[in-house]
């Protein structure tokens, strides 16, 4: 079943976080192996580069990998089947991903150094950076940061984002309770859920573009 695409400036009937969870589960129904494989690939590569040069590897490549992983999760939420090569798309636009990774990390870290609350505010406001960037890489890192902030705080969606963080935590804890094996399903599910949140925020925005759902 498809929802009608967003047209003009008519407000989009944004899914609730629980509806996003349900849609994400449905989107993964026949693609669990792909989603789990991509998540394991991301985890292994991230762990390897994180051990290089006291974290220098993560600084250098973390942005490109986040770009590619988020793109695969967005595609899964949209009912598409991402190719494994999509995971490495971030290296085609390496500089913007590096800048976005550094700026996001520094801003959030400064927020937590000052006080916990500013750190949480920054983390919520910049939570959509790599989703924006993977959709519009040609517009660069600065645009991605500003657009992420606009979609979350400026548009008044901060509680929805925070709610998704809490729901994701519950899903992860549920995976742990399932003899630990459930984590292999919970982790990609959470990744698709957070990608879906981005799509819902974007579609609900008066300046967003069309996306069709399955």
Descriptions of predicted regions:
Residues 40, 44-56:
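Short, hydrophobic transmembrane alpha-helix segments
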Residues 1-12, 21:
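N-terminal leader/transit sequences and adjacent low-complexity N-terminal tails
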Residues 2, 6, 208-214:
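Intrinsically disordered cytoplasmic terminal tails of membrane proteins
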């Amino acid at each position: 079943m498809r929802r009608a695409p967003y047209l003009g400036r008519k407000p989009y009937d944004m899914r609730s976080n629980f509806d996003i969870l349900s849609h994400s589960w449905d989107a993964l129904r026949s693609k669990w192996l792909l989603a789990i494989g991509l998540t394991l690939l991301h985890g292994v590569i991230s762990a390897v580069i994180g051990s290089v040069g006291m974290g220098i590897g993560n600084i250098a490549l973390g942005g490109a990998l986040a770009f590619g992983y988020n793109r695969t999760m967005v595609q899964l939420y949209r009912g598409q089947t991402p190719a494994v090569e999509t995971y490495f798309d971030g290296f085609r636009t390496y500089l913007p991903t590096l800048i976005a990774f550094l700026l996001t990390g520094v801003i959030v870290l400064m927020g937590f150094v000052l006080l916990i609350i500013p750190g949480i505010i920054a983390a919520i406001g910049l939570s959509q950076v790599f989703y924006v960037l993977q959709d519009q890489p040609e517009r660069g890192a600065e645009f991605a940061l500003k657009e992420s902030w606009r979609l979350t705080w400026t548009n008044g969606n901060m509680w929805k984002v925070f709610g998704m963080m809490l729901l994701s935590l519950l899903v992860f804890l549920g995976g742990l309770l399932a003899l630990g094996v459930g984590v292999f399903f919970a982790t990609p599910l959470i990744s698709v859920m957070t990608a879906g949140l981005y799509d819902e925020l974007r579609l609900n925005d008066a300046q967003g573009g069309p996306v069709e759902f399955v």
